[in-house]
């Protein structure tokens, strides 16, 4: 039962990341169209954060979920209820890191298009790295 809810949780994350990646790509296209064809690599590549850090690893997780060896190991790991909550918290932290990376990339792209800089844009990269790596760390410590 917990494994099926885990798979549905991952399916939900894939849908959210797909919608967010599409939003980032459409936002970048519209923003650059109205900025008189001035481009920024940060703006163009913002959609890659949810794709590379969210969708691809989640598809791999789903493929691993279906293997018999993983199901046996997961049955032992998820036999206690509190561990599954820790797993969900780690995935939510990773998701927040992905969103922070993408928003920071869009913000940096906006600054590049306007031809200005801001020291505070580095906060997005540090916060995104902290959240994403922290989520992975919680997941590794749990095992």
Give the role of each language-model region.
Residues 1-3, 73-76, 141-143:
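Short, charged juxtamembrane terminal tails flanking transmembrane helices
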Residues 2-5, 62-63:
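C-terminal ends of transmembrane helices
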Residues 5-12, 38, 78-92, 119:
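Juxtamembrane loop-transmembrane helix junctions in multi-pass integral membrane proteins
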Residues 12-34, 41-68, 90-111, 123-142:
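Hydrophobic cores of alpha-helical transmembrane segments in multi-pass integral membrane proteins
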Residues 63-86:
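Flexible loop linkers connecting adjacent transmembrane helices
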Residues 71-75, 118-121, 125:
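Generic alpha-helical propensity signal that fires on short helical segments
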Residues 112-117:
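Membrane-interface helix termini and inter-helical loops of multi-pass transporters
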């Amino acid at each position: 039962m917990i494994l099926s809810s885990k798979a549905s949780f991952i399916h939900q994350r894939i849908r959210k990341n797909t919608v967010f990646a599409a939003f980032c790509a459409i936002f970048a296209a519209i923003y650059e169209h109205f900025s008189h064809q001035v481009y920024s690599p940060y703006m163009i590549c913002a959609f890659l954060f949810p794709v590379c850090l969210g969708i691809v690893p989640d598809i791999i997780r789903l493929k691993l979920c279906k293997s018999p060896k993983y199901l046996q190991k997961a049955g032992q790991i998820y036999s206690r209820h509190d561990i599954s909550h820790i797993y969900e918290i780690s995935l939510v932290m990773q998701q927040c890191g992905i969103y922070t990376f993408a928003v920071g990339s869009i913000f940096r792209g906006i600054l590049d298009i306007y031809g200005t800089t801001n020291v505070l844009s580095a906060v997005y990269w540090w916060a995104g790295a902290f959240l994403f790596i922290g989520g992975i760390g919680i997941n590794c410590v749990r095992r």
